[in-house]
Amino acid sequence: MADLRVEMSSEKERIKKDRAKSASEEGVGVSYGAVLTLLAGTAVLAAAVYYPNSLIVGELRTLVEKIENQTKPTDHPTPRDCYDIRAQNPNSTSGVYTVYPGAIRRGLDVLCDMDVDEGGWLVIQKRSDGSLDFFRDWTEYQFGFSNQLRELWLGNEYLHLLTSQSMYELRVDMTDFEGESRFAKYKLFQVGSRDTKFRLTVGGYSGTAGDSLSPHHGMLFSTKDVDNDQASGQCAVSFKGGFWYSNCHTANPNGQYLKGEHESMADGVNWKTWRGYKYSLQTITMMIKPL
């Protein structure tokens, strides 16, 4: 636990430095864009004088327009996550919103929960009715998939973008088929880049469901076609999902939707510390927001 606290502290300092660096780079980027605009504009004038009928003039004008569009400041701040949306409008309701993690230009449509635990939560995973197959390959987990947002996996690339821009906490809400509910919260949640095989950093548990996720701390992501676990076999194949498997799991939120008690071992939507390895939960939702 002491090692985890040290890691959380160092991670917090790293993110602060990265955000400061990012802000500095953004400022440099605008100045650089202005210089590019000036140079390209000068080139347009020169080309118009020496090559009045040339296609170069039109091409350079197009370049100037592109640079100007890329460097124009936005009229309104763009939300990075659901917490920003809630902060900008305290009356926001749960639903789909567009966010811009890592300053991606085209935006990302996400499901926001504005009701649970003071709201501002961004849903990264959801199981509710078994309508979607989660036994998928690496690329699908990398970029995400959903079924009209009834069930979804946001995508590992987006998880990395989101959790690299600030310190995030994770909340996992779950229910069984007998109508009982439990939750687990983690004060630290981060997903590494694809170069790290989306390495998981998680810790600081509290809640009522028991801590089934901390044993996955430091694990790499595995799917049925990419084996990064610590077992001799393939955990993703054996337990029918994609996750940060170790040897193999104590949490399997992306397993088969088996509707309660099942005879097979640990291949359902399992949370070991609550209902064990032979009970598949009715619902489970993983959500994040910045600390």
Where are these regions (language model features)?
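Mature hydrolase/peptidase catalytic cores and their serpin-fold inhibitory cores, especially
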Residues: 220, 261-265
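Assembly "stalks" and propeptides
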Residues: 2-118, 179
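C-terminal helix/juxtamembrane-tail motif
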Residues: 265-291
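Conserved, non-catalytic sequence blocks in retroelement Pol enzymes and Pol-derived host proteins
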Residues: 145, 224-226, 274-277
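Extracellular beta-rich globular recognition domains, centered on the fibrinogen C-terminal
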Residues: 74-217
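Surface-exposed interaction patches
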Residues: 184, 194-257
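Short secondary-structure subsegments characteristic of cysteine-rich extracellular domains
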Residues: 143-147, 151-153, 248, 253-259
